[in-house]
Structure formats: structure tokens, C-alpha cells
């Protein structure tokens, strides 16, 4: 009979600390801003497309069909798919954040055009054309955050010795869900404040005439949403500093630590500079002493002196209990 282990009590404080840990990583924070802004914008556009087509362009036809959200979403997605190979090429040639932001001006332009276009003077054919232009920025904005994510985990591992992929991924998903919920909710709240009339008849074929204020609100929210959120994402992409060259060095230092390779003074200084630039200040409580493996994959014991010599400069000096007591 195996002895039962003591049941650990749930520590809410420790739980919060462990899941807040990724946000100590400067590169991860900027990545989250890029990700949430781009995807929240997508959520709001998806929600507004129906109102925009059904209410703002009510009664207008294109190719013999009533204007619907299909004329917005379909061209948007087609252009996004076309941009994927180009984004991939620019990612390898330039950087991932460059591939993310290269089409964002088109995204912003498209949103502004949707805000200013109205049936009284705009040919309906401009709707899919503008959506197509917007999609040139939409593709990179949707694709690159997922490719950038592992690099932020690498930055964290270089700085602390801990590769908390699950925690980083969980907080990324949580931020996405919260941002998406607030974005879609905001659409409903704003339209409600502006006097949008709901269809309570139960018959979707019945059209409810909206006030000019509500129609203007739909157009303005469409434009302001894209302009503001994508501008934030664009700014964050410039603040995100991990490029291909730095990433290669980050992975070199991670691999060197795992293999117990001695770094030269120049390499140690380079690693410290990367940690300061890409991660920020390292909390000693977050530091995990990595296992050193030999060529056969066996764990090699490392002395405290070796740990302090190799990792102290980047992690903050690793001290044992005796040295701490001496200070006190």
C-alpha cells in the first residue's frame, strides 16, 4: 500500500504570482499588445460587418445581390491568404515584427474608408475593393503573433533559466479571450447608447429603420476601431526588439547554459545586455538553475561556485543560505 501524500492547500497568492510571471518579460508584454490589439480589432470588425452591410447599406445591391457582410469578410480573407507567403518571406529576410507591421497602413486606410463611405455618394463596388485593401494588412496581423510567441518564451528562458511555455501560452489565451469579449461587448454598448433599435419581432426578414445617429455610430466605430487598435499594434511592433540576429544569440546562450559551456567575458556581457534590453530586470525568485547535460544526455552536477560564476551576472548573484546569514 502506497502511503498517502499530504494534500496541498490552494495558495491563491502563489497562483497569481506564477501566472503574472510572463508579464515581467518586456518582449512578451509588447507581443501581447500586438496580439490582443490585432485580434480585438478583428472581433469588432466581424461584429460590425453585419450592422454595416445590413443597416448602413440597406437597399443597395451589388452584382444583383443585396449588400451583405459577405462582401466585406470574403475579400478580407482572400487578401489575407494571399499575404501569408509574402509575410513569411519578409519574416526570413527582415524580421517577424516587420512582417507583422508591413501591411498595417493598408489596414488602417481600409478602416477609415469604411467610416467615410456612405450610399449617397459611394459606388457599392468600393466595399469589396476596400475590404481587399484592408486584408493586405489583416494577413500579417493575424499570422505573425503566433510565430512571434515562441521567441518571447526563449527570452524568458535566457533570462531566468525557466521555459514556462504553458504559463506563457495560458496567459496569452486569457488575454485574447478577455480582449475579444470586451471588444465585442463594446460594439453592443456603443450602438445601444446611440439609439440602435433591435429587431424583437423574431423575423429576421423584417428591417428596422435606424436613426441617422445610429448609422453614423456604426460607420465611426468601424473606422475608429481599426485606426486606434491597429495604431496601437503598430506602435508595439516597433517596441518589440527581438530580431533574427538577436534570436540566434538568445538560442546560443540557452544551448550553452544547458551544455555547461563557459562563456567568455565578451559573451557574458552580450548576454547581460540582451537580458536587460529584451527581458528587463530579473527577479531572483524567478531564477531556475538549469540542468546541465553531457553529450549523452546525462545530468551533470554543477557546484554553487560554478552557478554563481556562469549565471550570477545575468540572474543576479545566486547566494546560499550561509552567505545570506553573514550579511545579516
Which sequence ranges carry the predicted segments?
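Long, low-complexity, intrinsically disordered segments
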Residues: 297-328
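Short linear proline/tyrosine/threonine-rich motifs used for host-factor recruitment
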Residues: 253, 292, 299-302
Amino acid at each position: 500500500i502506497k502511503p498517502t501524500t499530504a494534500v496541498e492547500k490552494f495558495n491563491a497568492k502563489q497562483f497569481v504570482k506564477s501566472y503574472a510571471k510572463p508579464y515581467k518579460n518586456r518582449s512578451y508584454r509588447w507581443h501581447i499588445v500586438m496580439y490582443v490589439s490585432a485580434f480585438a480589432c478583428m472581433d469588432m470588425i466581424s461584429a460590425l460587418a453585419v450592422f454595416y452591410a445590413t443597416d448602413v447599406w440597406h437597399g443597395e445591391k451589388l452584382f444583383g445581390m443585396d449588400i451583405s457582410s459577405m462582401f466585406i469578410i470574403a475579400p478580407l480573407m482572400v487578401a489575407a491568404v494571399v499575404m501569408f507567403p509574402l509575410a513569411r518571406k519578409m519574416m526570413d529576410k527582415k524580421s517577424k515584427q516587420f512582417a507583422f507591421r508591413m501591411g498595417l497602413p493598408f489596414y488602417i486606410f481600409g478602416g477609415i474608408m469604411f467610416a467615410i463611405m456612405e450610399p449617397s455618394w459611394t459606388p457599392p463596388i468600393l466595399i469589396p475593393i476596400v475590404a481587399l485593401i484592408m486584408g493586405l494588412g489583416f494577413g500579417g496581423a493575424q499570422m505573425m503573433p503566433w510565430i512571434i510567441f515562441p521567441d518571447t518564451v526563449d527570452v524568458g528562458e535566457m533570462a531566468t533559466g525557466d521555459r514556462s511555455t504553458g504559463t506563457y501560452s495560458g496567459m496569452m489565451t486569457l488575454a485574447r479571450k478577455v480582449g475579444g469579449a470586451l471588444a465585442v461587448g463594446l460594439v453592443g454598448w456603443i450602438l445601444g447608447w446611440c439609439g440602435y433599435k433591435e429587431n424583437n419581432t423574431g423575423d429576421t426578414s423584417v428591417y428596422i429603420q435606424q436613426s441617422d445617429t445610429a448609422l453614423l455610430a456604426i460607420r465611426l466605430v468601424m473606422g475608429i476601431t481599426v485606426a486606434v487598435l491597429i495604431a496601437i499594434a503598430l506602435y508595439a511592433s516597433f517596441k518589440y526588439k527581438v530580431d533574427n540576429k538577436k534570436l540566434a544569440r538568445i538560442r546560443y546562450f540557452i544551448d550553452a547554459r544547458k551544455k555547461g559551456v563557459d562563456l567568455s567575458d565578451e559573451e557574458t556581457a552580450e548576454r547581460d545586455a540582451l537580458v536587460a534590453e529584451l527581458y528587463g530586470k530579473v527577479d531572483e525568485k524567478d531564477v531556475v538553475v538549469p540542468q546541465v547535460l553531457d553529450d549523452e544526455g546525462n545530468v551533470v552536477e554543477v557546484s554553487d561556485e560554478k552557478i554563481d560564476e556562469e549565471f550570477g551576472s545575468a540572474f543576479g548573484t545566486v547566494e546560499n543560505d550561509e552567505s545570506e546569514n553573514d550579511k545579516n
